[in-house]
């Protein structure tokens, strides 16, 4: 997981790996463990993200904001991005605003 895509260490300790292109998204999907969250934009192309080592709701929201930030923008659509997060049989759906760059720069690894 550490060698694929963009990496972020989220404030509550979660490790987020996010694909930069389709090949990395596919590789991340192969690396998903049973305790990992998979996070994707629900209505547009964008990165696949894998959140590991955290069940904190705040880390999940920050991960969703990062997915929204790096997802393809809709010119006529709202700024909020519908996001789906899955962990095993559990699915959570919500909307996320893209995180501003200055908010997450210190999280990059």
Where do the model's predicted regions map?
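Nucleotide-activated chemistry modules centered on ATP-dependent adenylation/adenylyltransferase
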Residues: 1-50, 55-57, 67-75
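Acyl-donor binding region in acyl/amide transferases
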Residues: 58-62
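Helix-rich interaction surfaces within compact, conserved domain-sized segments
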Residues: 70-109
């Amino acid at each position: 997981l550490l060698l694929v895509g963009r990496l972020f260490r989220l404030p509550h300790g979660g490790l987020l790996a996010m694909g930069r292109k389709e090949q990395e998204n596919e590789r991340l999907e192969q690396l998903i463990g049973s305790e990992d969250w998979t996070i994707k934009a629900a209505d547009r192309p964008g990165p696949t993200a894998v959140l590991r080592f955290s069940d904190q709701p705040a880390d999940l929201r920050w991960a969703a904001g990062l997915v929204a930030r790096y997802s393809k923008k809709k010119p006529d659509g709202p700024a909020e991005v519908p996001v789906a997060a899955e962990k095993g049989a559990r699915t959570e759906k919500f909307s996320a605003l893209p995180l501003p760059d200055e908010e997450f720069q210190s999280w990059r690894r």
